Every structure is written in C-alpha cells, then in structure tokens.
Amino acid sequence: RSAGVNLTRASLDAAVKYPWTLAEADQHPKGERSKKFCVYPDDEPVFRWLKIGAPQAAKPMECQIMDLSDDVAYSVHDVEDSIATGAFDPIVLADPKMLDHIIEQTRAWYGAKWDADKLLAAFMRLRREHLFPAHFNGSRESLAQLKNITSDLIGRFCWSVETATRDTYGPGPLTRYSSNIVIPENTNYEIVALKGIAVYFVM
C-alpha cells in the first residue's frame, strides 16, 4: 500500500501528541473536559511499528517540544488577542474577587490538580513583572507594547524550560527517548494562568 510521504519513524513519532487510542484515553487524563487521543483504528499498525522499542505511552523529546510550543502559543496569543479585541482588560486582575473567579474557572476547565494558591501566585508574578499592559487603547503605541509583551512572555517560557532541561541533562544532543523536557513549576502555572484568562473571558 502507499506509504504517503514515507516519513521516518522518528518524524512520525514526533507528531503523535497523544500516543494512545480513544479506548485508552481514560488512562491518560489531562484534566480537560474532552478526551485526548491521536491513534485511530486505521493508524494502529503504523503506530505499533513506530513505537517499537519505545517506553509505553511515552513521548519522544521532539513531541514534548511540540506539545510545549502548542501550549505556549495558545496561552500567549489567546491573551494577546483578547486584549486587542477588548474582551479582556488586564486592569481587572487588580480585583481579588475577579482573580478568584478566573482561578475557579481555570480549575474547572483544566482540573483541580492546579493549586489555587499557586495559580494566584502566578498571576501576581506576571503582574509584578509588568507582563500585562497597564493600559491598552488600541493605538499603534499600545499595539506595539502588546507585541513586545507577547514576545517577552514567549521568551520567558522558552528560556526557563531550556535552562531547566540543560541543567538536568547537560549540553549534549537531546533526542528521542534519551531525555525529557523539564518545565519548572512556576512556568507551568504561568502558562495555565494565561490559559485561564482565555477560558474566563473568551470561551
């Protein structure tokens, strides 16, 4: 049968974000409302082939990077868009009651495993380090400031993960199943806090 573009085992493996079937999805809860899976019945022969010798249900380094990139892009750009369109005004984060509501919705959407106090601390860090625009009025100047903040957030998350991963595994090549990305807890919570803004103001 046709092999399509005939990708290598490593390339295919890197693209399987949720390496299990729908029937196996309950064994891999992500705390979200819908079940996540990538392996359909027609895919199973190729999936079993590409996972030969791999740890069960594990993702290779390349797939972990893709997964993190997706989380960072989604969290940062959804907040950017919500500010640009007027759906979210960061000034509301100064209201403790509003923060409580956002955190409640975040945990309802992404799961109670996300500690409320740590989510609050993440919001406070991001505000304290001026990673939300103080005033946004749609002007060219404020749009430029928003773009700069977006870039700062992406750089912040990527730098923290790269640093933590290199501190753990050293400077050599990091490929396939030789290593895992290391995401600091504070970074994880900041990403989920941004996702929570999208849940509360956009979803």
Where are the predicted features?
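C-terminal subdomains that position terminal phosphate/3'-OH groups for nucleotidyl transfer/ligation
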Residues: R107, G111-M203
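Sequence-structural signature of the catalytic-core scaffold of metal-dependent phosphohydrolases
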Residues: R1-L143, I154
